[in-house]
Amino acid sequence: MASYASEVKKELTSLEVHPEHAKAELAAFLRMNGVLNLHDHQFSLDITTENPAIARRIFKLIKVAYGIEPLLIVSRKMKLKKNNQYLVRLNRDVQKILENLNIWDPAKGLVTRIPQRIMKSSEGAMSYLRGAFLAGGSVNNPETSRYHLEIYSTYEDHNEDLAKLMNEYFYLNAKMTKRRRGYIVYLKEAAKIGDFLHVVGALNAMLNFEDLRIMRDMRNSVNRLVNCDTANMKKTASASAKQVEDIQLIQKEKGIDSLPEKLQILARFRLAHPELTLKEVADQIPDGPISKSGVNHRFKKLHELAETLKE
């Protein structure tokens, strides 16, 4: 069964590739998942994934952005889960493309920060975040887990730039933390996760997420109410049991008829209706209705009398 995150990614890979924004999305893929190789003084660039839809997406992004069809190689993993592995290999104009995407600088080498032309464009930010989520993102199922969406980065400065894109353009309240082999930017608020899905274009996933979130919140509210009612019932039952115990002691030692009239009425009514709450007793007592504090005062008198009889 496909995970919730894989369903979100499936929707994102089905979106139309827009020529103006293909480079921003591709830049995220290559910066985060690309492996640069050098053979016979020639660069090649590999991106490997187990998701065929993501492999097709990368293939199409390269074709739309640069008019080049990369190689698509399918192999079978022999260790652990024997899934197919998809390798997209670019072996033409690699350095030119990496320089154009601001991933490679001839003088400085690898550039790990997100370029300013993307940092200063909301449309570019949307496309880059989409690519980043497809390359290194995950999101928990809102129905079964705690709310959590994250994107993993190898480089700290890249992680900082992702958080800046999320927060400065889309107010997502993204947080950062270090992992053993890298860094993550993450969201914990359900509403912000829904906003992120909308930003990157996963509209169906966003609507589904909101439906599941609302249902989960409703269930939690009902459970809280049930728990509260149960606690109140236990509290009522405990108080009633103590009151009945006091009255039964008075009845045994002195008799209810020995009590003042108001206490007699309350004592007999409580013995007949041990299930009622204090408010219900106050409303339904034969010489009432009276206030809860009035009923409570009478019960206190009965308790004091019962305590003297125990001595």
Curated annotation (Swiss-Prot):
GO terms for biological process: cell division; regulation of sporulation. It comes from the Bacteria. Pfam families: HTH_WhiA (PF02650), LAGLIDADG_WhiA (PF14527), WhiA_N (PF10298). GO terms for molecular function: DNA binding. NCBIfam families: DNA_bind_WhiA. Involved in cell division and chromosome segregation. This is Probable cell division protein WhiA. It comes from Lactobacillus helveticus (strain DPC 4571).
